[in-house]
Amino acid sequence: VTLLLSKLLKEKSPDIFNAALALRRKTDVLPKIKKEKIFCWHESFFMTKIYCGTYIGEQIFPGWYYLYDLRKNPEDILSLNINNLKEEISKSKKWVRTLKANRSPIIMDKKYSMLDEEYKEIGYSEINKRYKLIEKHREELSHKLRIIDEEKFKDKLDFDQENKLARSEEHTSEL
């Protein structure tokens, strides 16, 4: 069944088939997303959704990368300080996406963004304009996002340690 399905995919959608094979090794992911200025990828959570964006930087976890969803106008977020950026990140309609290299992502040409009504409405011209703005401020934005993630991770570790200590004290008092 798998072999027949792959043959069918190769015949009907060779672009997708080749893109699926291209990033099977996680070491190939970073060079690809750095090389492609604007690209599409998909994410699935109950339904599959296409994204069009660009690479921002590496996250605090190895093999995890920040991607910027170009649906969001970067002018709205680039001037924000870290606290306001934290707030903005927590809102729905996430514009910062995480790409995990060990998930064999499928990176496609930006032309596939036009299959989505929002991107079609924005248009290539505006998408390119937004990309150029992100490219210009990539390092600064990546740095701010890493600081936010480091704080979150530290808070989580502190919380976990406090819980372990509380459970340990509970257990000791029961003895």
What are these regions (language model features)?
Residues 38-148:
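A conserved active-site cap/scaffold subdomain adjacent to cofactor or substrate pockets
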Residues 147, 151-168:
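Charge-dense, low-complexity intrinsically disordered regions
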Residues 20-45:
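Short, surface-exposed recognition loops and adjoining beta-strand edges that mediate ligand/DNA contacts
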Residues 1-25:
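Acidic, Mg2+-coordinating catalytic module of metal-dependent nucleases/exonucleases
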